[in-house]
């Protein structure tokens, strides 16, 4: 399916599922390609199983769920816009400020996903990563919920912002690779939530920036609410 300089809207009703692609056929003719825009609407589910790396346009999940059944199948989303305007580009957006009454979810299951360009999650967005799954980000931020037993990785030299305790609700690790920066933002309520359910952060030569996080209470140390491990990492703003 080729999407040129146009918008393809997938409006899927609640309790309905549309499947595109075949995990056993890399050359499936129903894979996605092009430079346009994909918008997921409706409360139903869109399942993407094909190799969609020829799609370099933008994608917005405004309502319902998008499930990725194949690893690294949307690596290049956003590339066309980011090449022409690198200072103001988006790749994949989960949720929306315009339709904040809806719930939008990106479900990667146990697949391995890398997003070269921005992965942005709004307050009504959900990113689900199951055990064995990993999402590698290079830029962007998430203010919605990140959940599951999988792993979120900030790639080498990347930069990512997590806002609110709900964005740090993984039972798996958040890994910050060499020269990458993970910034956390939140208030006292977020801190209290994190203290009751600490997030594991592994610094593999990366930087954890707490400059925009709330002041830590009383005798609390900077990692109160965080389980920090790894080697060669740096914590700033604590």
State where each predicted segment sits.
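Beta-strand-rich extracellular passenger or scaffold domains
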Residues: 1-238
